[in-house]
């Protein structure tokens, strides 16, 4: 039985350098060579998971098929490799200590003093080794930055694994910043040297150094890093900025990253087939048309909050050979300026389509409903996701059905609670979600059925509140069709407006299943509707 090899990806100097994209790109390259891979994320923070963390702190919460709330990097892993992540592919320090303390309370440690070494590090190693049978490579991204106190148990676990398995089964890729100083007009390698010394201090030596920078790093600078960091010149690889993340597998292949990984393990494989990636890059660089989609939300200053959403739009744009320009519209009041109908209209007047994404809390919801009303009354393609769908229902009930006191139980007590809580109110915040993949029945002859070319689908969910079934008849007799229902018929999963070019709201998150090689059918249909609108307008 073959034994998996382990690739560890660490980062130095600063965070947000793109370790997740490096791990994803390496996974894609190894797949192109014919290997079976899996990618995992080890996060040093003390939260159990990112489910209750602020989007401004952490960015998007990516939901897996089996209902885990995970780091947004798992979305990159899925999109680059096509492999569905699971709850076993993301661990946090908080989850580790939670498990450790449960074991201690059960008496599993038989009265021993419970310590970081060996007990925490043993749990980390168990997570890394779990479920690796039949795989060629397991890629593990270590969150945070080398030198952070929170990362030390993870680095110690990697050191122990490296010592036990040896170079024949372990490689360490270190991603580091090589900043450009405009005053000196040169790239500075000193931060990289210090970062590698931090690794050396905990007993680790990188095998490959990836140098992130604004521009290409010269051979002289690479040689300096190689000499001072004890890494061969061929393993010091320049990683300059790119215009789009899907250029990375092609770039890293050209830089020899995949080749160096295989040479480290003394493996020889045919030249990788990157035809698909090259086609994607070509489509992105040579769009035939440009359209503008407005995303109306309250975290528009933090685009990572909507990472999968933006990527799903990108995938559908690639498949339609167009470029999607995003117009970010904040739905909250700013600087004392009220967001009224005129204000929102001015923000949206140059948009070809409007999308209202998911979210929580009542902050900014009136602004979102103004955007929904604008799309509905002006026949502009509209896509509402999760909260976006719920607000579309409330706006419709207010302005079409003419209910006087209608809202969501999430925000207000009202006469017509058209949106209600799905489950038990007396549960911890992190335990009240409807999470993961659920089947949905689609009405034949609906726009939803046309988009999917199917009437039974499975989509990922992350929500507490649902459309109140008591109002289904009111909605439908006024023209808002409930075109998607849960398998058991208890949840309204999708609505669409009659006599509108494209007005669809869904309770689930289709963006989590979209990939560059298989764009999500709803996003493809949405963008096609946008293109058709532009043709009619310009024709």
Swiss-Prot record:
Disulfide bond keyword on record: no
Chain residues that bind ATP: 16-21, 73
EC number: 6.3.4.2
Binding site for Mg(2+): 73, 141
InterPro entries in the cross-refs: Class_I_gatase-like, CTP_synthase, CTP_synthase_N, GATASE, GATase1_CTP_Synthase, P-loop_NTPase
Key words, A-Z: ATP-binding, Glutamine amidotransferase, Ligase, Magnesium, Metal-binding, Nucleotide-binding, Pyrimidine biosynthesis
Residue ranges of the region described as Amidoligase domain: 1-267
Binding site for L-glutamine: 359, 387-390, 410, 464
Single biological process term from Gene Ontology: pyrimidine nucleobase biosynthetic process
Catalytic-site annotation from UniProt: 386 (nucleophile), 509, 511
Pathway: Pyrimidine metabolism; CTP biosynthesis via de novo pathway; CTP from UDP: step 2/2
Residues holding CTP: 15, 148-150, 188-193, 224
Main EC class the enzyme belongs to: ligase
Gene Ontology annotations for the cellular component aspect, listed alphabetically: cytosol
Reactions the enzyme catalyzes: UTP + L-glutamine + ATP + H2O = CTP + L-glutamate + ADP + phosphate + 2 H(+); L-glutamine + H2O = L-glutamate + NH4(+); UTP + NH4(+) + ATP = CTP + ADP + phosphate + 2 H(+)
Record text on subunit structure and interactions: Homotetramer.
Chain's role: Catalyzes the ATP-dependent amination of UTP to CTP with either L-glutamine or ammonia as the source of nitrogen. Regulates intracellular CTP levels through interactions with the four ribonucleotide triphosphates.
HAMAP family assigned to the protein according to its UniProt record, in alphabetical order: PyrG (MF_01227)
Other facts: CTPSs have evolved a hybrid strategy for distinguishing between UTP and CTP. The overlapping regions of the product feedback inhibitory and substrate sites recognize a common feature in both compounds, the triphosphate moiety. To differentiate isosteric substrate and product pyrimidine rings, an additional pocket far from the expected kinase/ligase catalytic site, specifically recognizes the cytosine and ribose portions of the product inhibitor.
Annotated protein name in UniProt: CTP synthase
